[in-house]
Every structure is written in structure tokens, then in C-alpha cells.
């Protein structure tokens, strides 16, 4: 076949391609002409046209199977609090709890036992304070925080004659007097306090001229009522008043209605006091308050090694301190 015949045969095809290219979009969608068989005697042209316009949407397909559950997303922001709900019903009464310690017991467990302990806790002022006996009973006592280092528990005080010390056994057992002046702490209390550990004794005396005297003893204890409040005294240590108590060591307490001394008569009645008399005394600090020198014999607030049997001191204080 000659080339002119081929050209003539392909002219309509070229025109068709030109038309389709004109109608196709400007994108890379033009028809493609492919000529095959160039080496053979026959030539074959294959024309691939441009894509047609999209057809109408088909009907909606069936829903596919559910996919696997996705992982939990991050928490969202907290929402606004809702309104309060109605008050709930009252619950049932619970079982009672164990009984707690009473206030008094707690105070006893942690409270001071002596004036010296109060001093170590920072109570530096002399005055009346509450301490606790071994049976947890509270007891108000006069603490001397000034004399000889402080920490003394005062159990006897004479100062103005305002209180009568010529009393019976029951009065000396329980104690008597006034916190504002003269008093005896009570033999039961003195026993309970001195039965705890070791205590030293100090006696302070002041005459009507303002002169001070004292006597100290290494240890001091008063036995219980079954032993008639016997005096158990240690050695005399020092003091310008001299020793007028050692001779009363191991003596029983005697009052006007209970005679426990070693004399034929009742020493408490003879010398108008109450004391650890033997036969009868060299000191009588619970005797009559006679205001200094007196003509009667040995019935005043006497300390014989100090100012003798005929001088009644203005001030007498007996006190003990834990050692």
C-alpha cells in the first residue's frame, strides 16, 4: 500500500481525534492514538477516548460490618456541678465505741506528782498548785519555788496565830487551816507523798525580830495510820537552827485524844500541841502561838536548839522535796 493511500485513509481518524480533544477537559485526559503493526504490511490505529461525564449516583449500598472498638480517648473537661440532691435518710445507730479515759485519769497519767516536778516543767512561782497522789487523787499543795533551789512541798505553816493547832487525831489525819495563812496538810497526804521515793526535809524558822534560821535532814518519811504516822528521819545535814528533831526519829504521832508517846501522861495535852512526842519533846512546832518569849515552859512554837523552850517563833514552815 502506498503512503498516499494510507494518509487518505487516516484523514477521517485525525479529524475525529481533533474533535474529541477539543471536547475533552484541559487536563491530561486527551485520547491516546496507538499505531501498531508498523513493521507489517498493514497498519492498525487504536484510539482510546477521553473519560465520559460521571453517571448518576447509584443506590446506597448495604452498611458494612462494624469495625473493632477504638481505644479510649482522653477525658473531657469536668462538667459543672449539678444541684445538690435531697437529704438522705438517717443511718442506723452504730455500735458504741470503747470507753475512753476520764479527764481525771488523763491528768493523773500526765500531771505532776511533786512540787519539784512542777519546777522542772517551768512553774517557777511559789504558790498553791495541783499535784497527783499515787491513787490519782488531785491534791492542792503550797509549793516553795524560791528557798534553797525551790521545789519544796510545804506541809506545815505557822505565821500569825490565826489557826488553832491544838486539835484531835481526825483533824490532823485529814488536814486543816487556810491557804491564805496557817495550815497542816494532813497526815494521810504527808504519808502518801513521802512514800514516793526519797525526800529531804527542811525546817524554816523566823523570829519576831526577822532573824531566819533553818535545819535540813537527809531524808524524811511519815508512815501510814496503821503505824500511827511514825516519823522516819534521816541524818541532820546542816542549819543554823541546830538539830531539834533527830531525837523524835521513829516516834509515833500523838494528839490530845490519842496518846502514842512514851511518857506517863499525854504529851500533847501537857504541851498543848500535836507532834511526834517521845518523853516528851525538844521541838513542838504545832504548839501554842505565844508571840515570842513566854513564861510557860515548852508549850509554844518551840525549837529548843534554836531559841530554847521559852520562845515561840513567829514563822514556822516544814517542807520536803524529792531527791
From Swiss-Prot:
InterPro entries: Collagen (IPR008160), Fibrinogen-like_C (IPR036056), Fibrinogen_a/b/g_C_1 (IPR014716), Fibrinogen_a/b/g_C_dom (IPR002181), Fibrinogen_C-term_domain (IPR050373), Fibrinogen_CS (IPR020837)
Glycosylated sites: 249, 302, 310
Domain Fibrinogen C-terminal residues, every copy: 106-323
Signal peptide: 1-26
Keyword Transferase assigned: no
GO biological process: complement activation, lectin pathway
Gene3D superfamilies assigned to the protein according to its UniProt record, in alphabetical order: Gamma Fibrinogen, chain A, domain 1 (3.90.215.10)
Superkingdom of the organism of origin: Eukaryota
Keywords: Calcium, Collagen, Complement activation lectin pathway, Disulfide bond, Glycoprotein, Immunity, Innate immunity, Lectin, Metal-binding, Repeat, Secreted, Signal
Keyword Calcium: yes
Disulfide bonds: 108-136, 115-143, 267-280
Compartments where located: Secreted
Binding residues for Ca(2+): 259, 261, 265
PROSITE patterns: FIBRINOGEN_C_1 (PS00514), FIBRINOGEN_C_2 (PS51406)
Family named by the database record: Belongs to the ficolin lectin family.
Written domain comment of the UniProt record: The fibrinogen-like domain (FBG) contains calcium-binding sites that may be involved in carbohydrate binding.
Function: May function in innate immunity through activation of the lectin complement pathway. Calcium-dependent and GlcNAc-binding lectin.
Subunit structure: Homotrimer. Interacts with elastin. Interacts with MASP1 and MASP2.
NCBIfam families, per the entry: GGGWT_bact
Protein's name in the database: Ficolin-2
Gene: FCN2
